[in-house]
Amino acid sequence: MLGILRQRAIDGASTLRRTRFALVSARSYAAGAKEMTVRDALNSAIDEEMSADPKVFVMGEEVGQYQGAYKITKGLLEKYGPERVYDTPITEAGFTGIGVGAAYAGLKPVVEFMTFNFSMQAIDHIINSAAKSNYMSAGQINVPIVFRGPNGAAAGVGAQHSQCYAAWYASVPGLKVLAPYSAEDARGLLKAAIRDPDPVVFLENELLYGESFPISEEALDSSFCLPIGKAKIEREGKDVTIVTFSKMVGFALKAAEKLAEEGISAEVINLRSIRPLDRATINASVRKTSRLVTVEEGFPQHGVCAEICASVVEESFSYLDAPVERIAGADVPMPYAANLERLALPQIEDIVRASKRACYRSK
């Protein structure tokens, strides 16, 4: 019954999410002539890493015969067989524990959660087993495992399927936490995560899966890998710094376009990596623009934005010409109704208003 309810939630979201894709990304991402969807980027990254390393395998609910709830694992069962693509029961605690045990033994599991909301069923294994083992063993045990799946709000799937867990996992020593925006991000970061010797929480976004992005020839090479812990400046500017991650990068780029029409030059930083956090890039940008706006979908208290603001105040306070501006989701469980859901999430106009406040522009 639980599986049926989960699938209905996914199917119900599909009718709404198409209307939101247009708002997600600005097309100024890369200079490449080719395009690739985030879904295909993730699929190709897993495929190439499985082909290159026989220790890599995939496990999760419906990742095999159904090819994944979002088709990220399409074609992998046929290519690699059931020995390396494991369909699991609906028991996150069970299969996550098996994955961590396999990583202890030197294998490289890629564990899929149908949504990161369900990772709460397995949080003991993620934090107490995966994240702490290297420290508790004095470096003798590595846990090369990737926990991946959609994170944050989708479209009308309710409070129990819409939460952002970036701040939760980013607070834990021993974990690395990545959040891709584009196809290039998805390919490069997932390949880096699979190759990493430590546990990585890989936070995707359902509304980005079907979105196409320009992608360079370099990113299409099987050796392509992005560095963990390094942010990307998506758009350069001189008046205000906007820092965000995942789907909100697209919103920030749209806001930057609107701000440019009013004579405000916004620099947009795509974090890519939540932990480790690229404080150097953030602070260097703020020291140039003297203003900071942070954006995230998560709850406002104790969030990723709060950590970024604290870092800037600690390291670049004397460079600030205005108070830092923090934009986050509403401090409530996610509403189901579409109109209330929109009010609970940051919007492009929110970023524009906050940026103008930082620049002391009232209109």
Swiss-Prot record:
The EC category is oxidoreductase
Which residues does the annotated transit peptide occupy? 1-29
Q: Where in the cell is it found?
A: Mitochondrion matrix
Look up the signal peptide feature and give its range.
none
| SUPFAM superfamilies the UniProt entry points to | Thiamin diphosphate-binding fold (THDP-binding) (SSF52518), TK C-terminal domain-like (SSF52922)
Which keywords appear in this protein's UniProt record, sorted alphabetically?
Isopeptide bond, Metal-binding, Mitochondrion, Oxidoreductase, Potassium, Pyruvate, Thiamine pyrophosphate, Transit peptide, Ubl conjugation
Q: Where does thiamine diphosphate bind?
A: 92
InterPro entries assigned to the protein according to its UniProt record, in alphabetical order = PDHB_mito-type (IPR027110), THDP-binding (IPR029061), Transketo_C/PFOR_II (IPR009014), Transketolase-like_Pyr-bd (IPR005475), Transketolase_C (IPR033248)
Residues that, per the record, bind K(+): 145, 193-194, 196
The coenzyme or cofactor needed here is:
thiamine diphosphate
Cross-link annotation Glycyl lysine isopeptide (Lys-Gly) (interchain with G-Cter in ubiquitin), location: 247, 254
Q: Which residues cross the membrane?
A: none
The name this protein carries in UniProt is Pyruvate dehydrogenase E1 component subunit beta-1, mitochondrial
The species this protein was found in: Arabidopsis thaliana
